[in-house]
Amino acid sequence: MRAERVVDGDTFVTSSGSIVRLIGINAPERGRPFYLESKNALKALIEGRLVELDADVQDRDDYGRLLSYAYVGGEMVNARMIEDGFANVFTLPPNLRFAELFLSLERDAIKNGKGLWASSAVTGVKIAGQHFDAREYDEENLNDEYLIISNENDFAFDLTRFLLRDQAGHEFVLSLILPANGEVMVRTGSGVNDNSNYYLGCDDPVWNNDYETAYLWDDEGKLVDLFIFDRGNQHPNP
């Protein structure tokens, strides 16, 4: 079949009318930094061309879209989008056949500052740790699900309009100031912000307890830091 029309950097429509969601990757949504670059990259790879689709454990998502690895001329499009920095890895069990490959490609793209991973001029601001698996039930203890953002500078740092995102694409525009040589716990639930705690105001858990990546972008859409969590193995920015 042919790829008839690209929707965004991780979704396209086939000549038969099927909507295909590429497995293992996530691209910026409309209106977000790098949306057009990502969409155009996928268009250049597949639009109007013959594609071969290959499923994993699940063949459709909750929206009825086909979940697939897409191949054009023998090349896997999912992997190419990650390799070139036009999408981030989206690890979602049980569709994990190429998870390790995708993570390796993403690490290389980050090291080389490709696409999404162009480095910010911001220094000294880090995602320093996480507690994604709250005590008892996550849904009943949202404020025990948190990550830590630290400031290694000798001055307070304004993160207003910085973007915090998980690998699934949940986005939070921040409005907080990091204290000099301090840190802030960014908690999922609601509360009163202070010098040590910042609340996202969510009604449901955000961070995946098994596989997750937290990304922090500056107000120009440049990557400040990321934090990878994989079944208890924590990896700062590679």
Language model region names:
Residues 1-238:
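Small beta-barrel nucleic-acid-binding modules, primarily SNase/OB-fold domains
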